[in-house]
Regions:
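Contiguous, often N-terminal, cationic amphipathic patches that form binding interfaces
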Residues: 1-77, 86, 102-119
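Short, non-transmembrane amphipathic alpha-helical segments
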Residues: 81-100, 104
Length: 119
């Protein structure tokens, strides 16, 4: 949680806020099928619904009031993964900084699966 003191009091931003912003921003990028989560019981990777996108996001807080974001995603078959990942990093960093004022130290994109087209 990030806490900022002002002359009128304190502002705290919970990790769920960062997770929601990052998950939604990543989900809206071209080539991203959705956020991914690995089941702890069977080890399988599941595609998360848009309203659960924050479950594929982990946020780490640093002492210098910056954050690191880890995103677990599924991509569409045939996309250029480095280009999609770069787009995600730019989009998530922009949206998190714009919405919260917090500096993003790093964004790590983990491509957990590729969704094949159904025929």
């Amino acid at each position: 949680m990030i806490r900022q003191e002002t002359e009128f009091g304190a502002i705290t931003v919970d990790s769920n806020v960062y997770r929601n912003i990052a998950g939604l921003a990543a989900s809206n990028c071209f080539g991203v099928k959705g956020m991914a989560a690995r089941s702890r019981t069977d080890g399988l990777i599941y595609l998360l619904r848009k309203e659960s996108a924050n479950k594929g996001v982990a946020v780490t807080f640093h002492d210098d009031d910056t954050i690191t974001i880890d995103l677990h995603i599924m991509v569409d078959h045939g996309v250029n993964i480095p280009v999609v990942s770069s787009s995600i990093i730019n989009e998530v960093s922009y949206n998190v900084t714009k919405s919260t004022g917090t500096t993003v130290k790093a964004i790590n994109v983990h491509v957990d699966s590729i969704m094949l087209e159904e025929r």
